[in-house]
Amino acid sequence: MEKSYITKDCQLFTVNQMKLWPQKKWKQIVLVVVLALIVVFVAFATFAGLLLSGAISREVVSEIDVLNPDGDKTALVVYQPGFSSFPNDVSYAFADGLASSGWRVEITTASSEAPSDLSKYSLLTLAYPVYGGTVGTAIVKYVDRISDFDGVNTVIIACGGGDSGESIIPLKQQVEAANGTFYDSLALSNSNSTALESARQAGSSITP
């Protein structure tokens, strides 16, 4: 289709009107497929973003499990669950290691119900999932609720799908700002088949 225009000097010229919709059938099919893929990608990205936001920020209330009730000193393990059971499995493996070395271990999830008075604990362990290099909000909020760590030795465990070590730094600074003593840290990947054994050995290496 053409449109005609008259210039200031009364000259007539025509310009082909561009059409966004292709005329050939195969081009129409290709365009439809591309548009459909874009819509699916945007929808998936939005859904994944909502899921990720929920996993990072959600708090899960749970009972306090006690391992080795007759241990010499008491250690508290607080962890934030993730999409998979990996943070849970790592936390319990570490707690098992502590119990095997003589600790009485209390383990629970990061929530408003988790102990915030650390006066009876000689060791605190904070474990959390890492998504996009971000520390889980629930574990950060839990640390915020502790007004004074009273110098308690603190272990930080980052659980991710890759290198999650960088996420430890801001949480370490947060603990130290609240009068906590940074003791050690672990960055474990769920792609490592020996991750749980590494967590267990790390726990067993800490004596009461």
Name each model-derived stretch.
Residues S112-A114:
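Short acidic active-site motifs
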Residues C10-T108, D117-Y128, G132-P208:
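FMN-binding flavodoxin-like domain, especially the glycine-rich phosphate-binding loop
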